[in-house]
Swiss-Prot record:
Chief site of localization: membrane
Record gene name: ymiC
Membrane-traversing stretches: 9-29
Matches recorded under Pfam families: YmiC
Alphabetically ordered keywords of this record: Cell inner membrane, Cell membrane, Membrane, Transmembrane, Transmembrane helix
Subcellular location field: Cell inner membrane
Protein name (record): Protein YmiC
InterPro entries named among the record's database cross-references: YmiC-like
Induction remark: Expressed during stationary phase (at protein level).
Topology in membrane: Single-pass membrane protein
GO cellular component: plasma membrane
Amino acid sequence: MINTNMKYWSWMGAFSLSMLFWAELLWIITH
């Protein structure tokens, strides 16, 4: 259970970081 929970949170963290990265990159390109 702990292993599954850690995988879930690490995946969420990686996903949110990548989304922030792409949002920042698009902002720089479009502005």
